[in-house]
């Protein structure tokens, strides 16, 4: 006998005691399921498989992964492992808003790139370049100077935390016109 439901992972407790039933649950969680429960929801593995295909199709080689230290962190890590997605670098971050920006600054080498810009402006100011005023004006419109060592960022977060991470990326001069921003569907 097959039962469709329950919907939520929290409702799966004690279902393993009903040995003669199989439950087709709409939960997207895959960790610690009773043996007689089949997860039919969109889970992290299915999402990472789709992201993997996107990265391969677009020939994106260096992808960093940002995973919050949250209660679903292990679900995300399991999805990454099961999908066999290529990981350039994997970072875990604290979701406290004041800490996110500092961590993103470190991940993106913001201070080094900011210093590169200041050094270049000073170098041009002290040069004999006839176009130095125009060059300085153009540089002063920027926040940083120098490349990033990744092509895409996968953010495994949702709601306000996702907004905080993307805002921190923009603040550190990581722009979606230059880098792919990829997020998971909330589950």
Protein language model features and the residues they cover:
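Beta-alpha junction/loop-to-helix N-cap segments that form part of ligand/metal-binding clefts
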Residues: 1-31
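Soluble periplasmic/extracytoplasmic beta-strand elements of cell-envelope proteins
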Residues: 3-6, 64, 154, 182-183
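Solvent-exposed loop/turn segments at secondary-structure junctions
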Residues: 8-12, 28-32, 69-73, 95-98, ...
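Hydrophobic alpha-helical
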Residues: 10, 15, 152-170
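Short, structured coil segments at secondary-structure junctions
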Residues: 18-20, 33, 83, 177
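Extracellular/periplasmic Venus flytrap/periplasmic-binding protein
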Residues: 38-158
């Amino acid at each position: 006998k097959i039962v469709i439901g329950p919907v939520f992972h929290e409702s799966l407790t004690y279902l393993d005691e009903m040995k003669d039933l199989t439950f087709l649950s709409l939960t997207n969680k895959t960790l610690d399921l009773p043996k007689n429960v089949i997860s039919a929801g969109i889970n992290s593995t299915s999402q990472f498989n789709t992201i993997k295909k996107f990265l391969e199709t677009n020939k994106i080689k260096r992808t960093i992964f940002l995973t919050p230290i949250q209660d679903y962190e292990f679900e995300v890590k399991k999805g990454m492992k099961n999908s066999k997605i290529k990981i350039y670098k994997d970072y875990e971050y604290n979701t406290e808003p004041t800490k996110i920006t500092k961590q993103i600054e470190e991940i993106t080498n913001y201070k080094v790139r900011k210093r590169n810009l200041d050094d270049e402006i000073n170098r041009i100011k002290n040069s004999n370049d006839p176009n130095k005023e125009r060059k300085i004006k153009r540089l002063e419109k920027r926040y940083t100077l120098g490349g990033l060592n990744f092509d895409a960022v996968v953010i495994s977060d949702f709601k306000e935390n996702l907004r905080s991470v993307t805002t921190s990326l923009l603040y550190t001069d990581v722009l979606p016109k230059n880098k792919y921003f990829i997020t998971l569907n909330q589950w």
